[in-house]
A protein has these predicted regions:
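Glycine-rich phosphate/pyrophosphate-binding loop and the adjoining helix
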Residues: 1-2, 72-116
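Helix-loop-strand module that forms the ligand-binding subsite of alpha/beta enzymes
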Residues: 1-72, 77-78
């Protein structure tokens, strides 16, 4: 795996990630595990969109994948969530946008540290 870091994003459906994101995690996790832990010591961050509730369990689902795969998860100023129902509404979530920007700064910092 050439990437030094991975960001997985998903909408929140019924307090969990989308079926597509779950399939990616399940398949990539198995392939990684069966081939010597391909994601070990790489950076990973979860980014979720939610209408209202249920985003924290979805956020956890992605982070469990990273942590079980021995990945390094950078923090931010809050959970990496954006709130909105219709397309474009998440962009109006000022706290969510700030959290994402802070995550980007922290991810870039971590990638530089891990690379060296």
């Amino acid at each position: 795996i050439e990437a030094d870091g991975i960001i997985i994003g998903s909408p929140t459906y019924f307090s969990n990630i989308s079926t597509e994101a779950k399939a990616l995690i399940d398949r990539a996790g198995l392939v990684s595990r069966m081939n010597g832990d391909l994601f070990k010591r790489k950076a990973g961050a979860a980014v979720l969109a939610a209408r209202r509730g249920g985003a924290v369990p979805a956020f956890s689902a992605v982070n469990y994948f990273f942590l079980i795969g021995q990945m390094i998860v950078p923090g931010s100023t809050y959970w990496n969530l954006g709130y909105g129902m219709d397309p474009g509404e998440v962009e109006k979530d000022e706290e969510g946008i700030k959290t994402m920007k802070d995550l980007g700064v922290n991810m870039a910092w971590l990638l530089k540290k891990v690379k060296n």
